[in-house]
A protein has these predicted regions:
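Aromatic-lined carbohydrate-binding/catalytic grooves of carbohydrate-active enzymes
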Residues: 2-140, 164-168, 173-174
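Generic structural signal marking isolated hydrophobic packing positions
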Residues: 27, 157-160
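Structural preference for beta-strand elements that scaffold enzyme active sites
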Residues: 34-36, 78-82, 155-158, 196-200
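Active-site-proximal substrate-binding groove within the catalytic cores of carbohydrate-active enzymes
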Residues: 87-90, 94-154, 163-318
Length: 318
């Protein structure tokens, strides 16, 4: 954004707590009273977040008071408000991040980076690239987060990539294999669960499911490799009745109807990525990949999809 004659990065809210609550009220009026909401990019600098050793809920969204009001409203209706907290990667310095010990290392001893790439030219995009946290730091970071979260009154968190990412650390001083990291992740999830948090996990590596209250971004289709003759709803058969689960966001797929039918086939919940403000805010930003996310555009379709899902599958779905 231009500030005078100087281009500057400015943090703006894609959704506010007040407007999210208004949308939730509209859903309830339309007969949808069983849903959960995940707040993505709502702490520590937004989508390009800092390490969660401290906790600052974005003022542009409504701050800590706005968060509490929304969380209480949803809880009164029997629904959950998950706060997205990522313990495995970080985009920015700050919040006490020690880059010498808390960032994992490649075998080359360079800091471990999860690179993002520009869809326009295929080149590495520094703005969407994240550094991977050293798994040996998970316990310390989680301890600091719990102290900060207690003051805000947070009960539900989405541990994001902890359910799908598994990286080693090849710093010769403290080398970790991916198997070592798996055991650390299990210990971290057990720590959070035993501390009273309801956990939403992405992807759902098998060793994480024991600790999940719900799982999202579950793969409901095959990889599409030509050697595979058929796609069967294997994941749905395994998870059904054990944990609440949903696939990837329907409104981010090339074929909405096909993805919707796959959700029904697998007995999965419906998952949408939405924002309450004008989607043009995302143009020419690192979040421009979130296309077609306007609440106003999708509300009618969401109500229709919920009714269809209820008609076909409600009696046997969890």
């Amino acid at each position: 954004q231009m500030i005078g004659f100087v281009p500057m990065n400015v943090e703006v809210a894609a959704s506010t707590f007040e407007n999210i609550q208004r949308f939730a009220e509209e859903l309830e009026k339309d007969g949808i009273d069983d849903f959960d909401i995940t707040l993505q990019g709502s702490i520590n600098g937004g989508m390009q977040f800092r390490i969660p050793q401290k906790l600052k809920i974005e003022k542009s969204m409504g701050g800590a008071e706005g968060y509490k009001t929304l969380a209480d409203y949803l809880e009164d209706g029997g629904n959950k408000l998950y706060l997205d907290v990522d313990f495995t990667k970080v985009y920015r310095n700050g919040n006490g991040l020690d880059t010498s010990s808390q960032i994992a290392r490649f075998i080359s001893n360079n800091t471990a980076v999860l690179s993002g790439y520009s869809p326009a030219n295929g080149e590495r995009d520094p703005e969407s690239s994240a550094h991977l946290i050293n798994p040996l730091s998970f316990d310390y970071i989680i301890g600091k987060f719990k102290d900060a979260a207690e003051d805000v009154g947070i009960n539900e968190i989405r541990v994001s990539s902890m359910g799908s990412y598994l990286s080693g650390n090849y710093d010769e001083r403290h080398e970790l294999t991916r198997e070592d990291t798996k055991n650390i992740v299990i210990s971290s999830l057990e720590n959070l669960r035993d501390s009273g948090y309801n956990l939403l996990i992405d992807g759902g590596n098998i060793y994480t499911l024991k600790y999940a209250g719900a799982v999202t971004d579950v793969p409901l289709e095959s990889s599409g490799i030509s050697i595979e003759s058929y796609t069967v709803p294997f994941v749905g058969m395994v998870l059904h009745g054990c944990v609440d689960y949903s696939g990837v966001a329907l409104n981010q797929q090339g074929s909405y109807q096909n993805s919707f039918l796959k959700s029904i086939e697998n007995g999965a919940g419906l998952h949408y990525i939405l924002m309450t403000e004008d989607p043009l805010l995302l143009a020419d930003t690192s979040c421009s990949n979130y296309y077609s996310v306007s609440v106003d555009e999708w509300k009618e379709e969401i109500v229709s999809a919920y009714e269809q899902l209820s008609d076909f599958f409600y009696e046997v779905s969890d």
